[in-house]
UniProtKB/Swiss-Prot annotation:
InterPro entries: GcvPA, GDC-P_N, GDC_P, PyrdxlP-dep_Trfase, PyrdxlP-dep_Trfase_major, PyrdxlP-dep_Trfase_small. PANTHER family: GLYCINE CLEAVAGE SYSTEM P-PROTEIN (PTHR42806), GLYCINE DEHYDROGENASE (DECARBOXYLATING) (PTHR42806:SF1). HAMAP family: GcvPA (MF_00712). Keywords: Oxidoreductase. This is Probable glycine dehydrogenase (decarboxylating) subunit 1. It catalyses: N(6)-[(R)-lipoyl]-L-lysyl-[glycine-cleavage complex H protein] + glycine + H(+) = N(6)-[(R)-S(8)-aminomethyldihydrolipoyl]-L-lysyl-[glycine-cleavage complex H protein] + CO2. The keyword Cell inner membrane does not apply. The glycine cleavage system is composed of four proteins: P, T, L and H. In this organism, the P 'protein' is a heterodimer of two subunits. It holds the Pfam family GDC-P. The gene is gcvPA. Its EC number is 1.4.4.2. The keyword Oxidoreductase applies. GO terms for molecular function: glycine dehydrogenase (decarboxylating) activity. One of its GO terms (biological process) is nucleoside metabolic process.
Length: 448
């Protein structure tokens, strides 16, 4: 009989396992740990609670958190409050889908493989690229993997990255680059966009690629046509990090000639959850197909001529090439990719465009309200759903005050850039109402 109510192992099971490995007791397993540092006291645990009492206590603790159901959120900077269709959680909760791993056995995994194939197809369509992989960990690591691919493809050891790329993504790239002995140079930002003249001076024959964000960290839409011309004239690769929702309205990077497009599909069906887990995407042109990191699902036919889905081009991957694989990414974000697939399919092309349009319209309405009230709003009107407002008080102090009014304020840009101290990055998505936007602007009057 089991010693513990919720542990199925019996004393006999325990004895048999100890006999197999040749020890007499559980204590023998820890003989390498010196006696003097072993924990021998009783654990100072509180008395057990009943399930109702425990749920009550946990609910009380959870109620202290600010959430985007009860609070109006204007916080973005890479993680956004978006509409998630109810059907998303229903589908991803089904047992046949409930895994974060890519299936290796196609004969028993056709549903999962087809779902991943649909994710790849929709990402490729949105980005304007030839193909996309089955997902990455998040947008930051996808960007870093893109830079590694560019370096390997061009045999060059230097990457240029715009100063208007999200600082956290930039830091992830620098971490990856250190281990690969790749130099990373940051091209400064000027008026919220990449400094074109600085980029021209930095381009040389040792540059593997240039990384730009579209729309960028400050919300501005970068001039991809001009950047593409400069980068490709230098025989370097153009790497674009993009918000996939914005591509419902903006010209996709692929149409500008981007070589690699990466980003995060958190905007489709994935809650904020304190910043993770997310789901990166990775899309490329056909010429880079065999160098893509991660899994690729392809469509084929079986011996009976019926359509089927399989993992394809697996010779690139760790489980076959080991240390010579194109990337170290292994298990990925298949469950979150499924969530994004369901969200995109539920919205459909018309719904996705409408969702993007609401982001554009509501954020521009908010910017206009700030200007009408005399706030200094930085940069041009060429933005998607984020813009920068200058305030007279520290953003941390302002945001603490906003919380008392049921509002989650924008991102403190001074956290990364001293020159942007007291500057707030405001995100306005389709979830915000006119009344909430007006109340937000009114609440900031004292910090003008």
């Amino acid at each position: 009989m089991a010693k513990h109510r919720y542990l199925p192992m019996t004393e006999q099971d325990e004895k048999e396992m100890l006999d197999v490995i040749g020890v007499k007791s559980i204590d023998d397993l820890f003989q390498d740990i010196p006696e003097k540092i072993r924990f021998k006291r009783d654990y100072d645990l509180k008395p057990a609670k009943s399930e109702p009492a425990l749920l009550r206590e946990l609910s009380q603790l959870a109620s202290k958190n600010a959430n985007t159901t009860e609070y109006a959120s204007f916080l973005g900077a890479g993680v956004y409050s978006h509409y998630i269709p109810t059907v998303v959680d229903h589908v991803i909760s089904r047992s046949e889908f409930y895994t974060a791993y890519t299936p290796y056995q196609p004969e028993i995994s056709q549903g999962e493989l087809q779902a991943i194939f649909e994710f790849q197809t929709m990402i490729a369509e949105l980005t304007g690229m030839d193909l996309a992989n089955s997902s990455m960990y998040d947008g930051g690591t996808a960007l870093a993997e893109a830079a590694m691919l560019a370096s390997g493809h061009t045999k060059r050891k230097k990457i240029l990255i715009s100063g208007a790329v999200h600082p956290e993504s930039s830091n992830v790239l620098k971490t990856y680059a250190t281990g690969q002995h790749i130099e990373v140079e940051v091209i400064p930002e000027l008026d919220g966009k990449t400094d074109i003249e600085a980029l021209k001076k930095a381009l040389s024959d040792d540059i593997a690629g240039f990384v730009v964000q579209y729309p960028n960290f400050y919300g501005q839409v970068e001039p991809l046509a001009e950047l593409e011309k400069l980068v490709h004239e230098n025989n370097s690769l153009l790497l674009v990090s993009s918000n996939p929702l914005s591509l419902g309205l903006l010209t996709p990077p692929g149409e500008f000639g981007a070589d690699i497009v990466v980003g995060d599909s958190q905007v489709f069906g994935i809650p904020e959850s304190f910043g993770g887990p997310h789901c990166g995407f990775f899309a490329v042109t056909n010429k880079l197909m065999r160098k893509v990191p991660g899994r690729l699902v392809g469509e084929t036919v079986d011996e009976n001529g019926k359509r089927g889905y399989v993992l394809t081009l697996q010779a690139r991957e760790q489980h076959i090439r080991r240390d010579k694989a194109t990337s170290n990414i292994c298990s990925n974000q298949a469950l979150n990719a499924l969530a994004s697939s369901v969200a995109m399919a539920t919205l459909g092309k018309t719904g996705l465009v409408e969702m993007a349009k609401q982001n554009l319209d509501k954020s521009h309405y908010a910017k206009q309200k700030f200007r009408e009230k005399g706030f200094e709003v930085l940069f041009s009107d060429g933005f998607f759903n984020e813009f920068v407002v200058k305030l007279s008080k520290p953003i941390k102090e302002v945001n603490e005050s906003l919380l008392d009014e049921g509002i989650i304020g924008g991102y403190d840009l001074g956290f990364y850039e001293e020159k942007y101290e007291n500057h707030m990055l405001v995100a306005v998505t389709e979830m915000r109402t006119k009344e909430e936007i007006d109340a937000f602007v009114a609440s900031l009057e004292g910090a003008k």
